[in-house]
C-alpha cells in the first residue's frame, strides 16, 4: 500500500519479485493512479482507505495476507491490524510508525495538492530534485527521472503532472486526517506478527526514538536502516530486498 501522493508503480519491481512465488495485489487508493477520484474530498482519509481495502479483501476472498505499506500505507497496515486481528501474517512498514514527526508532516503539507506541472520529463525530474533533494542527496538525474515516471503522468494538455487528485490535500490539512494522533493501540495488533521496519537514515517522519519504542512492543521486529536516504526508501535497495525475502520465507 502506497504513500499519500503515490501509486502502485512504487512497487513495480518488488511486486515482480514477490509474484514469482505468491499472489500479489497492489491497490491504488481512491484518487491515485488508475483508481477513480472521490466525489467527496472529505473521504480522502486513512479510515476510508482502510475500509476500501477491507472491501477489496472480502471481494477477493482473502482471509490472511502479508501487508506492505509505505508511509500512509504503513498507517493503513496498523489500522488493519487493529480492525482485522489475526489476519496479517507478516508486515513490512516503510518509514512510518505509530508516531509521526511534526517536521515531516509540515514538509508534506507544503507540497501536497500544489498542482505543479512540467513541459518535459527532465524538467519534472529537476523539480523533484529541488523539492526532495535533502531526502535523497546522492540521487543523479536518472534516479530523479525514474521517480518522476513513478509519480507523474502526461496529461491531456501534454504537460507532465502528478498522478493524483489534488483534492486529497483538502482533508489532509485537518487535525487527525494526515495521521491519527496516536496509533500505539493499533500497533499492538502487530505485537506478535513477524515484521520488518524499514527506515531512511535521514527520515523526518520516523524518529529513532519511535523505532526504539516499536521494538519494545514487538521484540521480534527486524529493522533495516537505509543510509543517506530520507522519506522514504524505495524498497528496491539490496539490503531491503534481502530482508523482505527473509521475512516472506518465514511467514506462515
For each feature predicted by the language model, list its residue ranges.
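The conserved beta1-alpha1 loop
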Residues: 1-3, 199
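Active-site glycine-rich loops that stabilize anionic/oxyanionic intermediates
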Residues: 3-6, 71
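Active-site loop/oxyanion-hole signature of alpha/beta-hydrolase fold enzymes
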Residues: 12-20, 25-68
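Short beta-to-alpha linker loops that shape the active-site pocket of alpha/beta-hydrolase fold enzymes
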Residues: 28-32, 97, 227-230
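Conserved hydrolase catalytic core segment
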Residues: 63-102
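Conserved alpha/beta-hydrolase catalytic His-Asp/Glu region
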Residues: 119-173
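Conserved serine/cysteine hydrolase catalytic core
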Residues: 153-216
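Catalytic histidine-centered segment of alpha/beta-hydrolase-like enzymes
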Residues: 229-238
Amino acid at each position: 500500500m502506497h504513500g499519500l501522493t503515490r501509486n502502485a508503480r512504487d512497487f513495480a519491481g518488488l511486486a515482480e519479485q514477490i509474484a514469482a512465488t505468491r499472489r500479489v495485489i497492489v491497490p491504488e487508493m481512491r484518487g491515485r493512479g488508475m483508481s477513480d477520484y472521490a466525489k467527496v474530498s472529505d473521504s480522502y482519509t486513512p479510515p476510508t482507505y482502510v475500509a476500501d481495502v477491507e472491501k477489496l479483501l472480502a471481494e477477493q476472498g482473502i482471509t490472511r495476507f502479508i501487508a506492505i505499506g509505505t508511509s500512509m500505507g504503513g498507517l493503513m497496515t496498523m489500522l488493519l491490524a487493529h480492525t482485522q486481528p489475526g489476519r496479517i501474517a507478516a508486515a513490512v512498514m516503510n518509514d512510518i510508525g505509530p508516531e509521526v514527526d511534526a517536521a515531516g508532516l509540515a514538509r508534506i503539507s507544503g507540497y501536497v495538492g500544489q498542482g505543479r506541472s512540467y513541459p518535459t520529463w527532465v524538467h519534472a525530474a529537476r523539480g523533484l530534485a529541488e523539492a526532495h533533494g535533502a531526502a535523497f542527496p546522492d540521487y543523479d538525474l536518472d534516479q530523479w527521472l525514474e521517480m518522476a515516471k513513478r509519480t507523474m503522468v502526461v496529461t491531456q494538455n501534454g504537460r507532465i503532472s502528478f498522478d493524483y487528485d489534488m483534492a486529497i490535500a483538502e482533508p489532509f490539512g485537518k487535525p487527525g486526517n494526515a495521521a491519527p494522533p496516536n496509533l500505539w493501540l493499533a500497533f499492538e495488533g502487530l505485537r506478535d506478527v513477524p515484521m520488518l521496519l524499514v527506515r531512511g537514515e535521514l527520515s523526518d517522519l520516523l524518529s529513532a526514538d519511535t523505532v526504539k519504542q516499536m521494538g519494545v512492543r514487538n521484540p521480534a521486529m527486524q529493522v533495516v536502516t537505509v543510509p543517506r536516504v530520507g522519506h522514504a526508501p524505495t524498497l528496491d535497495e539490496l539490503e531491503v530486498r534481502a530482508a523482505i525475502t527473509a521475512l516472506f520465507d518465514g511467514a506462515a
